[in-house]
């Protein structure tokens, strides 16, 4: 393992550093990881790679990349954490705000442009109910990350 890793080693530019730090801290708060340091990210990357190599050695089917660059891995990990939160995964330790049917319909009405077909026709709410709720969850995730950004 390499010591003294920097955000540059992970392809994170200076404008993104605060947000990436906040996201990593948030996922620690969610109980998805215990180490939000770059060394922690690197350890998880190497562990994922070793797991994949072992599975391939046993002729198991592996989905995704067999090896991650640091830049690819941090993006993969942040995306995975976001999706775990949005899908309300069982590993996530968080008290989600309730999304009522009224909240979902109101969001849908205010953001109909997000729910249109290629020809410009809107999907009916019943067709996109789950997607609307996931978008609201994603905004909740972003709000939490933004709050942590302000504290850094």
Q: Which stretches of residues belong to each language-model region?
A:
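PPIase-associated folding chaperone regions across multiple families
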Residues: 57-152
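N-terminal targeting/tethering segments
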Residues: 1-70
């Amino acid at each position: 393992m390499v010591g003294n890793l920097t955000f540059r080693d992970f392809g994170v530019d200076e404008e993104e550093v605060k947000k990436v730090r906040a996201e990593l801290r948030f996922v620690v708060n969610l109980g998805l990881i215990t180490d939000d340091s770059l060394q922690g990210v690197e350890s998880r990357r190497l562990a994922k790679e070793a797991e994949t190599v072992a599975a391939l050695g046993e002729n198991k089917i592996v989905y995704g990349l067999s090896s991650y660059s640091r830049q690819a891995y941090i993006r993969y990990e942040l995306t995975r954490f976001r999706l775990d939160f949005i899908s309300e995964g069982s590993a996530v330790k968080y008290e989600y705000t309730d999304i009522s049917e009224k909240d979902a319909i109101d969001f849908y009405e205010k953001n109909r442009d997000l729910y249109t077909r290629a020809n410009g026709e809107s999907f009916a709410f019943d067709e996109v109910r789950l997607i609307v709720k996931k978008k609201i969850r994603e905004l909740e995730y972003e709000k939490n990350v933004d709050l942590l950004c302000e504290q850094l």
